[in-house]
């Protein structure tokens, strides 16, 4: 380390997280807040004016125009673009809806640097002329998926459909937990069925599984088990899994022309003159026939730029023996087979058929094999299954079909799109809304019940894949109706009360087409409770409410999905199922970590999260009706008492259980027990940044601000999933979901 001109040279700046790595990180509540296109930029409006057919023509021309700086395998970039699209979409996992293709985050670390994504930086650069031409009208996120989809069509796949509507982010998304490992291609996340949540990939830096087999062991049956778990965790069943693998491996090849020792660093670690490209391969030409990606050298089909059943035919025709690739990786070669596989760059060369361990899994696993053989015998069924599975893979994080844009959106709707019935009645007006609020408040339901179940319905929304939310009132249907956190028996009584109000209103609207849904009533109940609690605090507040939600039926519910996403933590309701797992030396095991995680899924900022906690506690909207965090003598009054008492230095807090999940607050002078709270409550007074916001709401002059802010954030959460508005009245949707921004 040297000092030059008063400046320390060679010293690395230390960030707060370097010094205090276990400090609760709130960064994910303030990422991607700015768009370089400006505040008025609306991608939906832009992409609706895109000439998609012109883009498709340009893509097809590009795919057949091999570039010297990165030559196309078999003279066609289609397989490379399919891999790019697949790896963009394929990082999606069902547990939290993160990953996937909807925001173009494959362009950023860590995903662009994963070993499984080697040379996809080249694929993105090849697409730059298209992006440059269409600019603000075409996002990278849409272009990447469109390129892979057009490639399939150009190589013979009869597509099922395609939708535009994916909006780019402009910085890395740091919300996903990709795993605890410190090195790429290692695993500390459990195995097979014991793979920890929320992970789907088996190793750090992979999309799914190690293609050599579990941990590099060439075991086809073991690979099948890992494949099944990984694909299920991204929402795919066995048939979809086989279709995707068999269809995807109809195209292109793997690359392992030489030793891995010659491979340069990833894009983020490469020198500045590389301009964001990485993986420079200093072996032979370093491209074309001398390319390294996975280290495996496999071309699956004799027709690698034409869709068909040749992959399956080859897989089941030959017997296979283990060999090493030129890079020393485990792969399989067909015994006594002729050289029928074309070379990617030399038309005069042929190769014997080869497969990956992950390919042999489709042959030797009994269930996979049964499906694969059926596809082999029924090519048309296979093509349709693959087209639908590809559509699902590339669209399942986009949300309901209201979010789909463009002329190629198919008519058919699937349960994974959270479908809803069409509304066939007139909406209530403002006068009706006020009357319904009056009836709800007179129904015998408490304010805490009204808020609790409105939150229970709406807060299932997650912006990661735009699923869940209050529209549809799925809370009254299985499996949400039996979630532990939703108080199943109490929920039945609450729904019954709403059904009575609904029936009386709808029957009383004779001569009119006006109707009210249970979904609207649940939200309206929460809003009525907030307004009444504000009135009790001495303030008049009007919480925005836009009717138009409809009621889903059981056939509209993706039951497997909603079983998987049952929450084990909801800090807003002071619910945490696993206090025994808390380790204070590991923030990722704590309920406060999961509070921030849920706040991110709800698109909340730090102040929005803080004010919501304070309001929910003031209203007593706690799991099991507990008094944890209800730091007020007047629950049901929308006061800032929670913050006042949390910040009160006359109270001393002590752990109340061995897990250090619950705490008791004692008067420092008298020793009298005054309050009880959880870690979620106390973190707002302990964490410096959260305390800074809590102090804003704990001031004497903050009572009205607290009420107004809580009302605004409640309105935001209750309307996040209103994609009917998102499409039909974007200005209104943006206003009502603006929260405190």
UniProtKB/Swiss-Prot annotation:
Pfam families: peroxidase (PF00141). One of its GO terms (biological process) is cellular response to hydrogen peroxide. This is Catalase-peroxidase. Homodimer or homotetramer. The lineage of its organism: Archaea, Methanobacteriati, Methanobacteriota, Archaeoglobi, Archaeoglobales. The active site is at residue 87. Binds 1 heme b (iron(II)-protoporphyrin IX) group per dimer. Heme b binds at residue 249. Signal peptide: none annotated. Keywords: Heme, Hydrogen peroxide, Iron, Metal-binding, Oxidoreductase, Peroxidase. It is an enzyme of class 1 (oxidoreductase). PANTHER family: CATALASE-PEROXIDASE (PTHR30555:SF0), HYDROPEROXIDASE I, BIFUNCTIONAL CATALASE-PEROXIDASE (PTHR30555). Gene3D superfamilies: 1.10.520.10, Peroxidase, domain 2. InterPro entries: Catalase_peroxidase (IPR000763), Haem_peroxidase (IPR002016), Haem_peroxidase_sf (IPR010255), Peroxidases_AS (IPR019794), Peroxidases_heam-ligand_BS (IPR019793). It catalyses: H2O2 + AH2 = A + 2 H2O; 2 H2O2 = O2 + 2 H2O. The keyword S-adenosyl-L-methionine does not apply. One of its GO terms (molecular function) is catalase activity. Its EC number is 1.11.1.21. It comes from the Archaea.
């Amino acid at each position: 380390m040297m000092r030059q001109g008063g400046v320390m040279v060679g010293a690395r700046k230390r960030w707060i997280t370097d010094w205090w790595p276990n400090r609760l990180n709130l960064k994910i509540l303030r990422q991607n807040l700015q768009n370089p296109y400006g505040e008025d930029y609306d991608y939906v409006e832009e992409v609706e004016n895109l000439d998609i057919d012109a883009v498709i023509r340009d893509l097809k021309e590009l795919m057949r125009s091999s570039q010297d700086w990165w030559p196309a395998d078999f003279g066609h970039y289609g397989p490379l673009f399919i891999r790019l699209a697949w790896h963009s979409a394929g990082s999606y996992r069902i547990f939290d809806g993160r990953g996937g293709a909807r925001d173009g985050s494959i362009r950023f670390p860590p995903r662009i640097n994963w070993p499984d994504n080697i040379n996809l930086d080249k694929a993105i650069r090849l697409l730059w002329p298209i992006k440059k031409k269409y600019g603000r009208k075409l996002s990278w996120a849409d272009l990447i998926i469109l390129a892979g989809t057009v490639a399939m069509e150009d190589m013979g796949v009869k597509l099922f459909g395609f939708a535009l509507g994916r909006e780019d982010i402009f910085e890395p998304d740091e919300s996903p937990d990709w795993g605890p490992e410190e090195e790429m291609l290692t695993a500390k996340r459990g195995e097979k069925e014991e793979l920890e949540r929320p992970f789907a990939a088996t190793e750090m830096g992979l999309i799914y599984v190690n293609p050599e087999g579990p941990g590099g062991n060439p075991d086809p049956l073991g690979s099948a088990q890992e494949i099944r778990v990984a694909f299920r965790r991204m929402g795919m069943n066995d048939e979809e899994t086989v279709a995707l693998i068999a269809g995807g491996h109809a195209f292109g090849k793997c690359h392992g022309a030489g030793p891995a020792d010659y491979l340069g660093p990833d894009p983020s670690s490469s020198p500045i003159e590389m301009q964001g490209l990485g993986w420079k391969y200093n072996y032979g030409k370093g491209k074309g026939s001398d390319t390294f990606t996975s280290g495996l050298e496999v071309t699956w089909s004799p027709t690698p730029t034409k869709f068909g059943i040749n992959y399956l035919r080859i897989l089941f025709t030959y017997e296979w023996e283990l060999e090493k690739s030129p890079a020393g990786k485990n792969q399989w070669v067909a015994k006594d087979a002729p050289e029928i596989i074309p070379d990617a760059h030399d038309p005069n060369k042929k190769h014997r058929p080869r497969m990956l361990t992950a390919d042999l899994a489709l042959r030797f696993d009994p269930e996979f094999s049964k499906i694969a053989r059926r596809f082999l015998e029924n090519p048309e069924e296979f093509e349709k299954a693959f087209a639908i599975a590809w559509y699902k893979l590339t669209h399942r994080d986009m949300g309901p079909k209201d979010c789909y844009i463009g002329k190629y959106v198919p008519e058919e709707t699937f349960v994974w799109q959270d479908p809803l019935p069409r509304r066939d009645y007139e909406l209530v007006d403002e006068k009706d809304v006020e009357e319904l609020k009056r009836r709800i408040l007179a129904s015998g339901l408490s304010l805490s019940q009204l808020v609790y179940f409105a939150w229970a319905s709406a807060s299932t929304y997650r912006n990661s894949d735009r699923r869940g939310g209050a529209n549809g009132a799925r809370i009254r249907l299985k499996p949400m109706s039996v979630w532990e956190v939703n108080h199943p028996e109490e929920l039945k009584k609450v729904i019954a009360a709403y059904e009575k109000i609904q029936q009386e209103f709808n029957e009383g609207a004779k001569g009119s087409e006006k109707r009210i849904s249970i979904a609207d009533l649940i939200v309206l109940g929460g809003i009525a409770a907030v307004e009444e609690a504000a009135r009790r605090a001495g303030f008049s507040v009007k919480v925005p409410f836009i009717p138009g939600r409809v009621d889903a039926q059981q056939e509209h519910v993706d039951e497997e999905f909603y079983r998987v996403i049952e929450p084990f933590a909801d800090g807003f309701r002071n619910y945490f199922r696993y206090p025994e797992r808390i380790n204070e030396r590991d923030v990722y095991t704590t309920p406060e970590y999961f509070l921030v995680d849920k706040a991110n899924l709800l698109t909340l900022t730090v102040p929005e999260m803080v004010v919501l906690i304070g309001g929910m506690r003031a209203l007593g909207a706690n799991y099991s009706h507990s008094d944890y965090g209800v730091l007020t003598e007047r629950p049901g009054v929308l006061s800032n008492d929670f913050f006042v008492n949390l910040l009160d230095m006359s109270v001393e807090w002590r752990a109340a259980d061995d897990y250090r999940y619950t705490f008791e607050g004692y008067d420092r002078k008298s020793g009298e027990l005054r309050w009880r709270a959880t870690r979620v409550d106390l973190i707002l007074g302990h964490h410096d940044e959260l305390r800074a916001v809590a102090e804003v709401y704990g001031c004497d002059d903050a009572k009205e601000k607290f009420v107004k802010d809580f009302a605004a954030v409640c309105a935001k959460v209750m309307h996040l999933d209103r994609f009917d508005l998102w499409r039909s009245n974007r200005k209104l949707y943006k206003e009502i979901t603006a929260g405190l921004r």
